[in-house]
Amino acid sequence: MQILDGKKLSQKIKESIKKEVEELKKEQDIIPGLAVILVGDDPASHTYVKMKARACKDVGIYSIVHEMPESISQKEIEETISMMNKNPNIDGILVQLPLPKHIDTTKILELIDPAKDVDGFHPYNFGRLMQGLDTFAPCTPLGVMELLDEYGIDVKGMNACVVGASNIVGKPMAALLLNRFATVDICHIYTKDLAEHTKKADIIAVGVGKPNLITADMVKERAIVIDIGINKVGNKIVGDVDFENVSKKASYITPVPGGVGPMTIAMLLKNTIKAAKQRKRS
């Protein structure tokens, strides 16, 4: 069994991005810029945004956080996005989810200029992803693919099982695997017999937020197991996979923490650089 070390790879990617940012500044006078919209007082959201801002600072990307109260109106968020769309110093716009219940999240995400949609949530970019075209892909599944590439894992011809069908992780994860010619099975809350699907899989990617959902008896020998789940159990952060027992059967597995999580932020930085380069070309 080999650990897919996202922490180590994310550091390597950040070092490469830092050099790229320095070259962009020196040769083309471009400073990539990221705007983050943060609504409400959710502690987890505030933690994630701080981590993203710190990562930007570490590599030389300019970032600005627009903090808004929980009571903010739909119109006020829309106006802020419109302003960021027009701002020539901003290459990427990120809305930290979840938004308060009175806000129409779909409408908010659709307002972001697709050329600045570094989270890859806009329907335009999602459509391009489904067609296998170059686009911004959501950062978490993109990070998974980068991790597989780093360890020389080619998914072509593999049976893949994606557990979870969210727009943020499950669906784009399935699309990215399909674009690499894996045969993809998508499971969700209404899947009748989850084990029936996971047992056939050469690669399992799970992200639903349920500790120990995937147990050793649900995984075939030498399977590749990608744990995208993040759950707090007591004082520990764990994934959706029973790591201790599944790791005895898997050929490769991601730990939680230190697997997919660090890759998500690394891909956000990568997408922001991509947006900055495209802005320069256009």
Swiss-Prot record:
Task of the protein: Catalyzes the oxidation of 5,10-methylenetetrahydrofolate to 5,10-methenyltetrahydrofolate and then the hydrolysis of 5,10-methenyltetrahydrofolate to 10-formyltetrahydrofolate.
Subunit structure and binding partners: Homodimer.
Similarity field: Belongs to the tetrahydrofolate dehydrogenase/cyclohydrolase family.
Keywords, ordered alphabetically: Amino-acid biosynthesis, Histidine biosynthesis, Hydrolase, Methionine biosynthesis, Multifunctional enzyme, NADP, One-carbon metabolism, Oxidoreductase, Purine biosynthesis
GO biological process, alphabetically ordered: L-histidine biosynthetic process; methionine biosynthetic process; purine nucleotide biosynthetic process; tetrahydrofolate interconversion
EC numbers: 1.5.1.5, 3.5.4.9
Binding site for NADP(+): 164-166, 189, 230
Family annotation (HAMAP family): THF_DHG_CYH (MF_01576)
CDD domains, alphabetized: NAD_bind_m-THF_DH_Cyclohyd
Reaction it catalyzes: (6R)-5,10-methylene-5,6,7,8-tetrahydrofolate + NADP(+) = (6R)-5,10-methenyltetrahydrofolate + NADPH; (6R)-5,10-methenyltetrahydrofolate + H2O = (6R)-10-formyltetrahydrofolate + H(+)
Identification of the protein by name: Bifunctional protein FolD
Domain of life, per lineage: Bacteria
UniProt entry tagged with the keyword Mitochondrion: no
Pathway(s) per entry: One-carbon metabolism; tetrahydrofolate interconversion
GO cellular component, one term: cytosol
